[in-house]
Structure formats: C-alpha cells, structure tokens
C-alpha cells in the first residue's frame, strides 16, 4: 500500500496531440517575483559535483521549464526522451481540442522530429502558479530545525515542501493525504497526530514536519538502503542518487519502488539506477512515480536560481 499519494501530478500530463500548421504563440518563461528577500531564506545545498550529472538530463530541463511557465503556455514534448518540440499558447491548444485536430497534429510532430507513429507526444501546461518559492522559503527554515532534531537530512523536507502543495497547504488528495507533507491518516496517527472530523494535526506544520521526519527515518531510508543493497549498490545517505531513491519510497511506497528496482536489475552505480527508474513501470510505480524525483530536482534547481537572483 502506498504511504501517501502525490497531489495533482497526474494532471500535469495530458496525452494531447498537436499540429505543425498551427500558428504558434510562444510565451517565454516568466521568473517568480519575490515579495520577501530571497536571501533571507535557508537552502539545503546539494554538492555541485553530484547535482551537475542530473541537471544535464533532458527530464530535469523539461520540468524546470514547466515550473517556470504560466498556465497560459504549454510545452509539446516527446514522452520518452522529454525532447521539447514546441511551446504554444493554451488558447491554441483549446482551439485544437475544440476542432478535433489533435490526432492529425500529433502525427505532424512525429513526422517532423522523426518519431514513430506509436510514440507518444504529450502536452503539459505551465505550472508556475503551483510552485511558489516565496512561500516555501520560510517553511524550509522551520522544517530544517525539526528534521535536524530527529537526525534526518533536511534535504528531504526541502524536496517535499517544494513539490507537495506549496501553494495550497490545505490541499487534500483523492487518497486522503493532507497538508504540506501530504500525509496519509494512518501515517499521521502512527506518529501521534490527531486525525478526526473535529481536528486534523496534519495542518499543524510543526507536528506534520515531525511525522514526516520520523517516517523518513523509520521507513523510507531503511527501505531504500535495503533496495540498494539488493542490486549490489552501497547505500550512502549523503549521495544524491540515494536521496532521490528515498524520495521515491516516500511517494510511491516501498513495495512499488522495490518492484521497480527489481525490474531495473543490476546497474553500475546509483546514478544509473535513478535514470532507469525514470523509465521503468512496475506495479503501481508508473508515470507519476517516475516524475517525482525529477520534479524534486527541477524545483530545487529553480529554487536555487531564484535565491541567487
């Protein structure tokens, strides 16, 4: 059973198809404007030598752009390679949908870029409104203290806060996950939080931070360690690849990630494991699960850039 469900990520992917004879209205990525000095916030840094490998990968560049674009803009992308083929206006997409021209359009894109008919072209609206770094900054500061006290690397808190309902802490997923950490009821109760009709401690940031940190310590990290060992890797809690594997456990649950890791099999190193997980489906480990660590990395890189402005 999944530990928790990610809110709203499935909505990022609409399998829609576009045409080359479209008059394209490209809108440039708009950077977020901060009403609070960004240098007043804390950022849990990832070592540059570890980050550089992943930041060059097409999926990360793709999600970086999605996070910066407003919902009025849309990216046309090849699903498997994350090759960004076009940026069009959302109005143009709506017009194509209304006039039932999407299937013809998709084939035009495939033909133009040399893809087979069976390969998927996807369309993703910008999500800038969802990723509000100005609101996340103060939360990272508070969460870092809690995670440090419990002995868990606060990089996990930062990843989660950057991608889990950052602009709507009261969000509730269809599976019942609630709050900044999108905790399921049974997880919250396990760590002493009250979840009832009259009171829900998952809305209490300090208490939910404590529960998320303990979940990482007791469940996510140990399971990620065992999975790494099972395919011949030495788990290193300070390595980015291991932290991303742990994030997958937080998102999809150990059982689903274990199936995906087993499907990947033997790899040369942890970085290769993560890249292969991004393309692996096993059990309930599907598209949203693949995207989770990609979003974590892309949002971190954009957050870091935002703080440096």
What role is predicted for each listed range?
Residues 1-162, 171, 214, 218-239, ...:
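Cell-wall glycan-active module
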Residues 247:
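Functional cleft and adjacent loop/helix regions within the main domain
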